[in-house]
Amino acid sequence: MAINIRKTHPLLKIMNHALVDLPAPSNISLWWNFGSLLGLCLIIQILTGLFLAMHYTADISMAFSSVVHICRDVNYGWLIRNIHANGASLFFICVYLHIARGLYYGSYLYKETWNIGVILLFLLMATAFVGYVLPWGQMSFWGATVITNLLSAFPYIGDMLVQWIWGGFSVDNATLTRFFAFHFLLPFLILALTIIHLLFLHETGSNNPLGINSDADKISFHPYFSYKDLLGFFVMIFFLAVFALFMPNLLGDAENFIPANPLVTPPHIKPEWYFLFAYAILRSIPNKLGGVLALLFSIFILMLVPLLHTSKQRSTIFRPMTQIFFWLLVANSIILTWIGGQPVEQPFIMVGQIASISYFSLFLIIMPLTSWWENKILSLN
């Protein structure tokens, strides 16, 4: 009998257990495609970023011009830049859908996998933030100034911390250089953590829509889910191509086509769309330190979700009341995203404050209480 090298070779054996002979639940739906889509996004971002870094100059006198040079003079530089910029948006769409899937089907009960996922989200946000500063446009400069300034809210060490990150007394050349270094380094850290994320996932196996043990009904990942993922790849690449080729600047800010000028403040300073929900929460609290803590907690609250799970069932598929509140949370997050892009005036301030209170209430109070109430109803039968 011929030896199957896929199953015996020390390196290929690891790949085989992760991608070919991996036992997967037979009933996982399209919502389980986003993990592999995120892997594809990461590879696209690293490759396009690598080619952009070859032509980019991390110096405040040349950064903006070097981006213009990439778009005008480098072969397909405009395409690489458009794919990289819109790929980031697509990355965040996939991340948010991946998290929503985890919340809906109770995947957060794999605590190690979930917590590493939250750390990955935080690193992804950090990478996107420092990357947005690199073109050195108006919104790049003022976004960096406003967001880094938030650290000054921390008592005693705040001002020192801000100047340490800036590398001086304002956002300047030292800031841009270190942000470029971080933007180059962090994706590789994300890649390493992704492997650990997968390692913990394969310890327990994938969850499934019913939220029950699927050991009795597993099928191999290849060819069933490898082809299913391939369909997702083509759909995502199609949307990425549509955005990169037909509307590359739709999700960006027009203000960033103006070179950075420390003497002129843009009328509305706002981050990219994928940060707007957290930015709205930050702005809804009048106290600076309170706002910063709420901003951090809006992401790290995800780490509390496994501890706040009070239901006897894992998935929300058989819990209609929890489903209603889950979709309320989705709608609430969309409202926060909209509010984050609006000017700081009434009625947006009030709507933002109500949406921020609702966001935390749904996670901390409403959903755990609803699950407890559903348990009571089930025990009556």
Curated annotation (Swiss-Prot):
Component of the ubiquinol-cytochrome c reductase complex (complex III or cytochrome b-c1 complex) that is part of the mitochondrial respiratory chain. The b-c1 complex mediates electron transfer from ubiquinol to cytochrome c. Contributes to the generation of a proton gradient across the mitochondrial membrane that is then used for ATP synthesis. Binds 2 heme b groups non-covalently. GO terms for cellular component: mitochondrial inner membrane; respiratory chain complex III. Pfam families: Cytochrom_B_C (PF00032), Cytochrome_B (PF00033). Heme 1 (or BL or b562) is low-potential and absorbs at about 562 nm, and heme 2 (or BH or b566) is high-potential and absorbs at about 566 nm. The keyword Transmembrane helix applies. The lineage of its organism: Eukaryota, Metazoa, Chordata, Craniata, Vertebrata. Keywords: Electron transport, Heme, Iron, Membrane, Metal-binding, Mitochondrion, Mitochondrion inner membrane, Respiratory chain, Transmembrane, Transmembrane helix, Transport, Ubiquinone. The keyword Acyltransferase does not apply. This is Cytochrome b. Belongs to the cytochrome b family. It is a multi-pass membrane protein. The cytochrome bc1 complex contains 3 respiratory subunits (MT-CYB, CYC1 and UQCRFS1), 2 core proteins (UQCRC1 and UQCRC2) and probably 6 low-molecular weight proteins. The chain crosses the membrane at residues 34-54, 78-99, 114-134, 179-199, 227-247, 289-309, 321-341, 348-368. Its cofactor is heme b. It is found in: Mitochondrion inner membrane. One of its GO terms (biological process) is mitochondrial electron transport, ubiquinol to cytochrome c. The gene is mt-cyb. InterPro entries: Cyt_b/b6_C, Cyt_b/b6_C_sf, Cyt_b/b6_N, Cytb/b6-like_sf, Cytochrome_b, Cytochrome_b_C_euk/bac, Cytochrome_b_N_euk/bac, Di-haem_cyt_TM. Heme b b566 binds at residues 98, 197. GO terms for molecular function: metal ion binding; ubiquinol-cytochrome-c reductase activity. Heme b b562 binds at residues 84, 183. A ubiquinone binds at residue 202. Gene3D superfamilies: Cytochrome Bc1 Complex, Chain C (1.20.810.10).
